Amino acid sequence: MDVVEVAGSWWAQEREDIIMKYEKGHRAGLPEDKGPKPFRSYNNNVDHLGIVHETELPPLTAREAKQIRREISRKSKWVDMLGDWEKYKSSRKLIDRAYKGMPMNIRGPMWSVLLNTEEMKMKNPGRYQIMKEKGKRSSEHIQRIDRDVSGTLRKHIFFRDRYGTKQRELLHILLAYEEYNPEVGYCRDLSHIAALFLLYLPEEDAFWALVQLLASERHSLQGFHSPNGGTVQGLQDQQEHVVATSQPKTMGHQDKKDLCGQCSPLGCLIRILIDGISLGLTLRLWDVYLVEGEQALMPITRIAFKVQQKRLTKTSRCGPWARFCNRFVDTWARDEDTVLKHLRASMKKLTRKQGDLPPPAKPEQGSSASRPVPASRGGKTLCKGDRQAPPGPPARFPRPIWSASPPRAPRSSTPCPGGAVREDTYPVGTQGVPSPALAQGGPQGSWRFLQWNSMPRLPTDLDVEGPWFRHYDFRQSCWVRAISQEDQLAPCWQAEHPAERVRSAFAAPSTDSDQGTPFRARDEQQCAPTSGPCLCGLHLESSQFPPGF
């Protein structure tokens, strides 16, 4: 038996052992001579969200009791909207009530309607069971999935028991999705998203909700996990413009310290929305995100920059975004209603200025080809290693704002080595005048709204008790993988300047490639288990949990 066969049999046995532990339940791995686990009542230690606390919860305050009464009174309004969904699905009243908060026992049916899970179940009868069984037999990332499942929402009463019912359902969903969508495969963030769905939806409904969330153009979440991250790039470019307009001092400090816009916190925004804040606020922000779509991402990021403005202006270059991810959590360490009120105001302001979404992408955007480097803002200090676009004739028009840029028509195209083509684009009607921003890119896909239909039902209603607490704390450290912009521009620039290409052949050899080799090897080694980059190149180390988890 050769080495390949031995390794294959070992992986198969390891996969079977993991599946068997989940089939046995929460007693898996314990000695057989141990008696039954003593029953422990959590009645006085579980808050209204299902978070288990170490000590008994204090009595309800007057403010908390008022919030509970308000949530109960809103329940009838949401039931009426679900009963007449065709009338309310595109109404302003739905958005207004989403910002005020969904009642807990309405959240499951509303999420199911927003993501249209019932229609997907009807169109694909029995497919989830098939994908789940295939994942059990052939999953390549089952060890990683098992490790992430063990650390997902461990302070929630549903996921507290190792190899318990909800952990088994979460494992099945992730295995099935790995088979259902090989382009995404498995990323660590999917376990947290699926766990949120499992709080209010049954297993199969939670699977189709995850499928719809990543497949919907309205939410554009697959761009954060798929290899072609055009959505992420467009949102980052738009964020750079919005933050520079609303907080010029903050962006000026970033430019001064060589903090590139590509290192912005938008890449880790989804993770922070999942496990960086209290569960109560997480659910309310996800309510808004499911109703509003990707329009909600930019206002949330803008609020975070605004609240953290003083800290950001004091951030040095040494590990800035690793510390920012931890400080970003302090943005939401406040009353839920206050955060949602500021979020609504920011949403209205950006919508009025048409800055809530990036402009539509060009046909070539979103592919695996390298993106052209956007022209720098006025007064911006380029990051080390960056190079401006080749010099051209002086521009006669100021650079248009993203939200109001005129339509552009291609003037000429320049073939580049490797088959890529770069187009010099100009505003329509000014084909003879070069534009100051050459071939600026945007995200992939169109940002149009999708109509909802279908009507589901469900899920469970938890007991209403004390205040919410943070469900767990992470010790996060991250490193950011940046794409060399010199490598992007050099082939196209040399195609237009053959003389410079000849001179560069006799120039002293650069040491950039030698220096970048170990970093590329480290990138490939860190990202090898996944079939796509995790949150636009942001790698987060494993979470640290107390002993016994």
UniProtKB/Swiss-Prot annotation:
Keywords: Cell membrane, GTPase activation, Lipoprotein, Membrane, Palmitate, Ubl conjugation. Residues 350-443, 507-526 are annotated as: Disordered. The keyword tRNA processing does not apply. GO terms for molecular function: GTPase activator activity. Its main location: membrane. Residues 101-293 form the Rab-GAP TBC domain. A lipid is attached at residues 318, 325 (S-palmitoyl cysteine). Signal peptide: none annotated. InterPro entries: Rab-GAP-TBC_dom, Rab-GAP_TBC_sf, Rab_GAP_TBC_domain. It is found in: Cell membrane. GO terms for cellular component: plasma membrane. Acts as a GTPase activating protein for RAB5. Does not act on RAB4 or RAB11. TBC1D3 is encoded by a collection of very similar paralogs with multiple copies of each paralog, some human genomes encoding well over 50 copies depending on ethnic origin of the donor. This is TBC1 domain family member 3I.
